[in-house]
């Protein structure tokens, strides 16, 4: 089916003669066959968002409908790849086209020439359905790739073709003539089905103490990370990619500046995966859509990332989907909405911004897959509010749709406190659901310690305002102890060095032991002050400096170091009280 161009407005064009076309159908626009997607149909007129630069198009040029929705290719070779927002392989296109892509440039997302050794797990006569594992695809230098039956496909196996297969070649033939290859295609805007959702009672461990202990998120949960320029969003996401409990990381660079994305592309291949010792990129899929790329492709990029993440989830893997940033995606939505002449909402964003964000975040979750395995997609969406204003629409809509807020503070970042998570603004809605897991796995009383630490930090904020007016020396020793204990907690527990091998990640048991010791120091020092011991004498023992060094110790050495410090604290306080 083909039509002709009758109207153009930036990345949005209108074609007529497409009466039989469907919403979200892929089309090729103009003589250069630019990629586009139908976003509105009125009679035989279709409004199309074009995923490439539209300058130079002329009225009357042909528009050809494909009959298929915008879809991604899923199969062996995804891991370690870098795509643009509509899954064009950037490395291969750069080798063919140079550093700047020509219009209409297109290549298959997965390498058609590469051969994979298919080792089947089914035999003729077996009945298979969506989610059943067909076998494993292997290739030198690549991780093993499970091959599963796509959702909606079922039948009895007629023939299995083991051995070297290219991704498009049939690997399993079903009775009735249907074939299953290593490659499948899936519409990006349609969530992949699962057998059932599982309760969110297992945490998504990040390795960052401030997040795991104070603001945890469940595996399959959602978190929003708002922060202004220079607050460490990218460094935090790199730390999460490296240390979080995820088998696969899907990183979507949505509308960020080109130099920032080039820095990420330069650094990611050099990051070492602590699990395997190999490059972190080997278990990462990167989707790059910079701010100078067409705005429509930016809108599609997060759905491309979600479809890829759900594909790996259906293999029984835990996937971390990171979007940097949803603000740029919302700006693309605003521009497209303006081109469509829709009624604007707050700050010009479309009125359906909240529902679109909520629908996207609903694709996260911990599920039992169609094949009976357990998989999860955990979403972490960065937000770039102008001027750090958390009351702007994208942040507020994200807060309503997600389970945690990890707010980054420019003030903490300027003080070189990383991760710069503001504990006075951040929150989680999943703390109570995850409390049982932390009590079992980290240590009994974990929740009580966390609440005590929060109260200590809140008390410090109150006293800091008084101290600014009258000076620290005017406070009583008990009040000055609160300030000192909170300082130790901030610098020794909440702050982490991403460059220190022992401190870059922290397991829950180590975090529990550290938190217990910090608060025990505060309680026992407070009791000693109540018995008449001056605060200066307690500080002169040097035990506070030893507390600050706990995080730099390997997790296996922390219990012994904590026991020694606890014994020295008891001895020092007993001696001072006796004097």
From Swiss-Prot:
GO terms for molecular function: ATP binding; proton-transporting ATP synthase activity, rotational mechanism; proton-transporting ATPase activity, rotational mechanism. Keywords: ATP synthesis, ATP-binding, Hydrogen ion transport, Ion transport, Nucleotide-binding, Translocase, Transport. GO terms for biological process: proton motive force-driven plasma membrane ATP synthesis. GO terms for cellular component: proton-transporting ATP synthase complex. It catalyses: ATP + H2O + 4 H(+)(in) = ADP + phosphate + 5 H(+)(out). Pfam families: ATP-synt_ab (PF00006), ATP-synt_ab_N (PF02874), ATP-synt_ab_Xtn (PF16886), ATP-synt_VA_C (PF22919). InterPro entries: ATP-synt_VA_C (IPR055190), ATP-synth_a_Xtn (IPR031686), ATP_synth_asu-like_sf (IPR023366), ATPase_F1/V1/A1_a/bsu_N (IPR004100), ATPase_F1/V1/A1_a/bsu_N_sf (IPR036121), ATPase_F1/V1/A1_a/bsu_nucl-bd (IPR000194), ATPase_F1/V1_b/a_C (IPR024034), P-loop_NTPase (IPR027417). Its EC number is 7.1.2.2. ATP binds at residues 227-234. It comes from the Bacteria. HAMAP family: ATP_synth_A_arch (MF_00309). Belongs to the ATPase alpha/beta chains family. Produces ATP from ADP in the presence of a proton gradient across the membrane. The V-type alpha chain is a catalytic subunit. This is V-type ATP synthase alpha chain. It comes from Anaeromyxobacter dehalogenans (strain 2CP-C). The lineage of its organism: Bacteria, Pseudomonadati, Myxococcota, Myxococcia, Myxococcales. The gene is atpA.
């Amino acid at each position: 089916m083909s039509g002709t161009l009758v109207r153009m407005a930036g990345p949005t064009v209108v074609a007529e003669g497409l009466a039989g076309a469907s919403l979200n159908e892929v089309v090729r626009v103009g003589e250069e066959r630019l990629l586009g997607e139908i976003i509105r149909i009125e009679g035989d007129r279709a409004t199309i968002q074009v995923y490439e630069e539209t300058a130079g198009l002329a009225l009357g040029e042909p528009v050809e409908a494909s009959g298929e929705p915008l879809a991604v290719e899923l199969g062996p070779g995804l891991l370690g790849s870098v795509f643009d927002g509509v899954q064009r392989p950037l490395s291969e296109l750069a080798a063919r086209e140079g550093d700047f892509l020509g219009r209409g440039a297109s290549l298959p997302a997965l390498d058609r020439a590469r051969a994979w050794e298919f080792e089947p797990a089914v035999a003729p006569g077996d009945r298979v359905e969506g989610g059943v594992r067909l076998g494993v695809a292997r290739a030198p230098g690549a991780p093993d790739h499970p091959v599963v039956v796509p959702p909606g496909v079922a039948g009895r196996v007629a023939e299995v073709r083991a051995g070297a297969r290219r991704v498009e070649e049939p690997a399993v033939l079903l009775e009735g003539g249907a074939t299953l290859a290593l490659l499948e295609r899936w519409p990006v805007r349609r969530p992949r089905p699962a057998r059932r959702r599982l309760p969110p009672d297992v945490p998504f461990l990040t390795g960052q103490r401030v997040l795991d202990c104070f603001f945890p998120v469940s595996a399959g949960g959602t978190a929003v990370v708002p922060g202004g320029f220079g607050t460490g969003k990218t460094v935090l996401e790199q730390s999460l990619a490296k240390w979080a409990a995820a088998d696969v990381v899907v990183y979507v660079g949505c509308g960020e500046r080109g130099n920032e994305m080039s820095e990420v592309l330069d650094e990611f291949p050099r990051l070492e995966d602590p699990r395997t010792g190999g490059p972190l990129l080997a278990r990462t899929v990167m989707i790059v859509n910079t701010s100078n790329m067409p705005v429509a492709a930016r809108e599609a990029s997060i759905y491309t990332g979600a479809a890829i993440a759900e594909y790996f989830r259906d293999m029984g893997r835990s996937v971390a989907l990171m979007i940097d940033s949803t603000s740029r995606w919302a700006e693309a939505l605003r521009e497209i909405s303006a081109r469509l002449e829709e009624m604007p909402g707050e700050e010009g964003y479309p009125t359906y911004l909240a529902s679109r964000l909520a629908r996207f975040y609903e694709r996260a979750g911990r599920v039992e897959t169609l094949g009976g395995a357990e998989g999860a997609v955990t979403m972490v969406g960065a937000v770039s509010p102008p001027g750090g204003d958390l009351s702007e629409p994208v942040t507020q809509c994200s807060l309503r749709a997600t389970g945690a807020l990890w707010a980054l503070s420019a003030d903490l970042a300027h003080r070189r406190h990383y991760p710069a998570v503001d504990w006075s603004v951040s929150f989680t809605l999943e703390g109570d659901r995850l409390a049982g897991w932390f009590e079992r796995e980290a240590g009994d009383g974990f929740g009580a310690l966390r609440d005590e630490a929060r109260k200590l930090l809140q008390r410090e904020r109150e006293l800091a305002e008084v101290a600014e007016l009258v000076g620290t020396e005017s406070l009583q020793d008990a009040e000055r102890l609160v300030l000192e204990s909170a300082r130790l907690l901030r610098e020794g527990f909440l702050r982490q060095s991403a460059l220190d091998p022992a401190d870059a990640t922290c397991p829950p048991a180590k975090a529990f032991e550290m938190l217990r010791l910090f608060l025990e120091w505060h309680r026992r020092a407070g009791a000693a002050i109540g018995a008449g011991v001056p605060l200066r004498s307690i500080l002169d023992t040097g035990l506070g400096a030893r507390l600050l060094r706990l995080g730099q110790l390997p997790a296996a050495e922390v219990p012994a170091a904590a026991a020694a410090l606890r014994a020295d604290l008891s001895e020092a306080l007993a001696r001072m009280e006796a004097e």
